[in-house]
Amino acid sequence: MGLSWTVPLEWGKNLSASNPLGFLPDHQLDPAFRANTNNPDWDFNPKKDPWPEANKVGVGAYGPGFTPPHGGLLGWSPQSQGTLTTLPADPPPASTNRQSGRQPTPISPPLRDSHPQAMQWNSTAFHQALQNPKVRGLYFPAGGSSSGIVNPVPTIASHISSIFSRIGDPAPNMENITSGFLGPLLVLQAGFFLLTRILTIPQSLDSWWTSLNFLGGVPVCPGLNSQSPTSNHSPISCPPTCPGYRWMCLRRFIIFLFILLLCLIFLLVLLDYQGMLPVCPLIPGSSTTSTGPCKTCTTPAQGNSMYPSCCCTKPSDGNCTCIPIPSSWAFAKYLWEWASVRFSWLSLLVPFVQWFVGLSPTVWLSAIWMMWYWGPNLYNILSPFIPLLPIFFCLWVYI
């Protein structure tokens, strides 16, 4: 026996109609109550409404127009009727423990009250207790012994150390690994930057060289050739088809030789300053060092130096003379002595130079004045060599 729903077509009249899909308003039908037209109170729905209000569009859980205002598919709850209600949250239960939470740490009693036996120890009692193998094993787990008589008891620390000795050390520190990788990368980046800057030195010097031939004007290479005429361009960037290309290559080659000579001079000065050029000085009264059988050094060098500290020569009288080699600037002193012998007037400059250096305020004022007057021109000339300064500094520090 199926259930049916009564549709009120007219006022006060109810007819029975089937509700197979359940989309019509929900009304409770009790077959035992024998609901029919003669019994109008057949509907047990407490939220029932007259038919004109049922035709109104209600706002329910499925949006406007989907759920009737008197229940339906979702039942009779306030949410299904389109009414949102917020229930207050239940208050937390009252705590019965009034001592909850972190309590303050009680003050520790004095050592004489908590450990009275520790106050009775002294140096003598401690050394006597160390005679016990068990106690000594706690203080000397690695087997150390001051008397060499007592054998300590092996402890857990000794077992762990033996295990690590068999299986290897723990994982290495990642900070050391990172620094080991970043160091070479930074050096490589700095080297690449200096290389790119050094490659610009020939072009800068070439531009300065060519500007000397075009005083008061812009250096322009016409570049006219019978085979392949080209437009006007800078003389420092001539194409291979330009007649000025060979002169540009020649200038670049001379500039490279000049830079190489400058680096060699700097390296020579550095080695001479470090004392790595043991040059025999000139014997007073002679222009050259004579060659003879006793030219080798007969006095050993002082300290751990691998270079001789003196040089023995055989002058014209036949007697060997040993002259000590300066520990620094030996080659420079040799060149100065050689130049003083060749050009006697250089010796007259020594007192003047010593006097001028002694006047330090005058020297500094003169240097400041010269830099103020010639500074811009010197900067334009020396600016191409600025990338070489870091290389010279590294050589000076690490050699």
UniProtKB/Swiss-Prot annotation:
Function: The large envelope protein exists in two topological conformations, one which is termed 'external' or Le-HBsAg and the other 'internal' or Li-HBsAg. In its external conformation the protein attaches the virus to cell receptors and thereby initiating infection. This interaction determines the species specificity and liver tropism. This attachment induces virion internalization predominantly through caveolin-mediated endocytosis. The large envelope protein also assures fusion between virion membrane and endosomal membrane.
PTM summary: Isoform M is N-terminally acetylated by host at a ratio of 90%, and N-glycosylated by host at the pre-S2 region.
Annotated domain remarks: The large envelope protein is synthesized with the pre-S region at the cytosolic side of the endoplasmic reticulum and, hence will be within the virion after budding. Therefore the pre-S region is not N-glycosylated. Later a post-translational translocation of N-terminal pre-S and TM1 domains occur in about 50% of proteins at the virion surface. These molecules change their topology by an unknown mechanism, resulting in exposure of pre-S region at virion surface.
Keywords in alphabetical order: Acetylation, Caveolin-mediated endocytosis of virus by host, Fusion of virus membrane with host endosomal membrane, Fusion of virus membrane with host membrane, Glycoprotein, Host-virus interaction, Lipoprotein, Membrane, Myristate, Transmembrane, Transmembrane helix, Viral attachment to host cell, Viral envelope protein, Viral penetration into host cytoplasm, Virion, Virus endocytosis by host, Virus entry into host cell
Pfam families per record: vMSA (PF00695)
InterPro entries: HBV_HBSAG (IPR000349)
Superkingdom of origin organism: Viruses
Pre-S: annotated span: 2-173
Species of the source: Hepatitis B virus genotype G (isolate IG29227/2000)
Gene from which this protein is expressed: S
Record topological domains on the Virion surface side: 2-180, 274-347, 398-399
Region (Pre-S2): 119-173
Protein name: Large envelope protein
